[in-house]
Amino acid sequence: MKKVPLNCEVCGNRNYNVPKKEGSATRLTLKKYCPKCNSHTVHKESK
């Protein structure tokens, strides 16, 4: 497993590092809490 960073879609802040299987072709999207936005927002995997 490889850890990938997640960026907030609203502010672009890099908040989380989550494990992901290396063979997966799709990008990860999760709804997580962003402390900078002070709300739950969509976070997408970044390179």
UniProtKB/Swiss-Prot annotation:
The keyword Ligase does not apply. PROSITE patterns: RIBOSOMAL_L33. One of its GO terms (molecular function) is structural constituent of ribosome. InterPro entries: Ribosomal_bL33, Ribosomal_bL33_CS, Ribosomal_bL33_sf, Ribosomal_zn-bd. Belongs to the bacterial ribosomal protein bL33 family. Keywords: Ribonucleoprotein, Ribosomal protein. One of its GO terms (cellular component) is ribosome. It comes from the Bacteria. This is Large ribosomal subunit protein bL33. It holds the Pfam family Ribosomal_L33. Transmembrane segments: none annotated. One of its GO terms (biological process) is translation.
